[in-house]
Amino acid sequence: MKKQRNLRSMAAQAVEQVVEQGQSLSNILPPLQQKVSDKDKALLQELCFGVLRTLSQLDWLINKSMARPMTGKQRTVHYLIMVGLYQLLYTRIPPHAALAETVEGAIAIKRPQLKGLINGVLRQFQRQQEELLAEFNTSDARYLHPSWLLKRLQKAYPEQWQSIVEANNQRPPMWLRINRTHHSRDTWLALLDEAGMKGFPHADYPDAVRLETPAPVHALPGFEDGWVTVQDASAQGCMTWLAPQNGEHILDLCAAPGGKTTHILEVAPEAQVVAVDIDEQRLSRVYDNLKRLGMKATVKQGDGRYPSQWCGEQQFDRILLDAPCSATGVIRRHPDIKWLRRDRDIPELAQLQSEILDAIWPHLKSGGTLVYATCSVLPEENSLQIKAFLQRTADAELCETGTPEQPGKQNLPGAEEGDGFFYAKLIKK
């Protein structure tokens, strides 16, 4: 039996590690969830994701309630108060229970002397909630994004930035990819209906289904047998442009966790696929995905800037480069991105993308296809990146995705759509 732990203090410490130490929630959360009961796993996730999604608001409210910020060893208490405020604002947890559990969290973080302070701030918010929220709704913090990112979105999308921000602040839809080697999408939707769930087919991507209500994977018909994979619709869009064929040699570069590797093999089961990623730890998930789906690919650890180290002089018929990026298109799915990224990261990422593109291009056969993709919405990583590549690469030609002046196709996040994603299809002359 799992030891009873204070979830509020665990959530506070996790959020502190993200914001103060730059750690990814996807690395922090799973080990924490192993320490709590199954019924508490979902609540711990909700508290962590929710606080990170609304961090600007919670920070603003605390600053209004306290004369000076908490620093040093008391900083965890700041995040514990955030967890308390989030529960009062956004959950159905009875206020008395939210307060009691949050105040008790002070003992778990070894700050029992601050129980009174935590209780006082939360009760003050309850008394002044209406006035505080009215004032908050006129502040810049209401957009729940860091100012540097807000400025970039406003510059890139003067007409659409608010809808992008609103989409980023919502809970993401759950998209699935139906394995066409097992069932047609319509057949699987009928199985889903029999299981008491409802799904909606994507209009453009032939394998994509959006669940009406997110569900645990073990409840999905045939998940363990490889009939279905959790993958956002926009990520599935890569196959529309890559169009892999049986018998071809195909490179999936920056492949982890393997969603696109396995999609290539569903579309072209007899393709010879090489999946490469720089992160050896994340490559284990590529193996896991291949195993669950009963597929085979050559999996290698390697740096995209130095392809000769892992593929020699080999050339490929098609290359999918899902480039390392700011991930500003998937904020609704990973709200910690807002607080992990910095403005200075963008030119550094653009430089890295440029180096990988230049290094991998010679490994594409003449007449071959390279699809450049990112889960970013920032032009520096997307249209401007491809525009510069076309200008310096004489044998590269843009195909089907945009114009040389405005290259690529940009998806923006939407409530019933996929994540923010960019694609450019390039042909080697």
Swiss-Prot record:
Q: What is its main location?
A: cytoplasm
Write down the Pfam families for this protein, in alphabetical order.
Methyltr_RsmB-F (PF01189), NusB (PF01029), RsmF-B_ferredox (PF22458)
Q: Name one GO molecular function term.
A: rRNA (cytosine-C5-)-methyltransferase activity
Reaction catalysis annotation: cytidine(967) in 16S rRNA + S-adenosyl-L-methionine = 5-methylcytidine(967) in 16S rRNA + S-adenosyl-L-homocysteine + H(+)
Q: Does the keyword RNA-binding apply?
A: yes
HAMAP family recorded for this chain? 16SrRNA_methyltr_B (MF_01856)
Family as reported in the entry's similarity comment: Belongs to the class I-like SAM-binding methyltransferase superfamily. RsmB/NOP family.
What job does this protein perform?
A: Specifically methylates the cytosine at position 967 (m5C967) of 16S rRNA.
Q: What is this protein called?
A: Ribosomal RNA small subunit methyltransferase B
* The organism of origin for this protein: Escherichia coli O157:H7
Organism placement in taxonomy = Bacteria, Pseudomonadati, Pseudomonadota, Gammaproteobacteria, Enterobacterales
Q: What gene, per UniProt, encodes this protein?
A: rsmB
